[in-house]
Amino acid sequence: MSKRIEYIVDEILDQYMYADTSFRPWIIGFSGGKDSTVLLTLVWLALRKIKRDTITPFQLRRPIYVVCNDTMVENPIIATYVDEVLAQIETKAREEDLPIFVRKTEPKLEDSFWVNVIGKGYPVPNTAFRWCTDKMKIKPTARFIIEQVDECGEAIILIGTRKTESATRARSIKKHEVYGKRLTNHTILRNTYVYAPIKELMLEEVWYIINAIPSPWGFDNSILFNIYKDASADDYECPTVVTDKSHGSCGQSRFGCWVCTVVKDDKSMRSLIKNGREWMKPLYDFRIEIDQERNIIENRMPYRRDGRRAINDMGPYVFSYRAKMLRRLLEVQHDLQKHDPKIKLISDQELIAIQVNWYRDFNFGYQVSEIYNSIYKESFNMEENIKNKLEADLMKEICFENPEEGELIEQLLLLQRSKSLMQRRRGLKNEIESRLKEFVNNKKQ
């Protein structure tokens, strides 16, 4: 282990034990990429050193949360890899009795990508309208951090940002760092501090740690190395300092959402396909398709969702295009499941929420279940409890100013369902009329 790496481990140890005597939690943002992997590796080594060199376990009372945000549209290869790594981290932390705990965050259902694009008609993001970052990345993790601050008073976020990543990263670090101080104030969240232990590491050192130091949680780091190698585009060159001459160029590949239309081209996915993952090509083609169709005027409504005229008549997607996109998405999912049945590009909850949003926008011409059934040749099972919850939420929103009318509608729906279950529709019309008269009479009193 190099002197610089030993120094970082000792600095982390000092910050954990001596520089900060409180027990405010550490929160490590973990993506499964090279930098967050190295950060967690060095923190783990520091904790092992504390446990080895101290007499009492009291020194390890500060909790460390490994927080991974799932946007629900992650690259399937990365998503599978990260899930396996997180499971191994949790298992090994319990075996070694370390205060490391895995937490996964994800956007709320109404903030998910497909509910917004297919359900509400949001145009797919671009550089001018990048609505996805806040809804799908920032908010979910921020909610977890705020919960920790509310419970503990303060929290410290450990990030794997490095100065040599880019000129932009270097400027950002320099702007916020305070000379002689390890911690800086979070720019947005109150009572939250930021610690960047590996900010001075070079890319060569990052790969050295991954390839030369065994994963503390027992995972095979060569898997990560090979993912980066296969995802490296031709115009990238990775300056590798590794222990085995068989390691070639691994690139500086960046992984994001597979459906991201903010970038012009998904070079990492294109390279993965080129290097043997041909089954991913439908994903790549679908992303290009929805990007190219974004600004076709026939695909857009002339009005915004709030009723105002849209600029250049480019409002939300029309319902026919939303239905077309859903059909194409499910076709791609069905195709990918021939390679791996576990792959899901859209969840059942999202499908239900899309239908609810279509009803909310008075679209009754397209049915999610019909689209699904035409592709999978089987009935789409809308879990009754989820369906009922979404209906109840919708009812509360619509009848916010007149809750008694919402109660009436619920009663009428229950009446209709009970008759349907008993297969006795006779008398339903009379009972509905009777209930309506009773409601009107009560209102008059």
Language-model segments: residues:
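Catalytic cores of secreted/periplasmic lytic hydrolases that degrade extracellular macromolecules
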Residues: 33
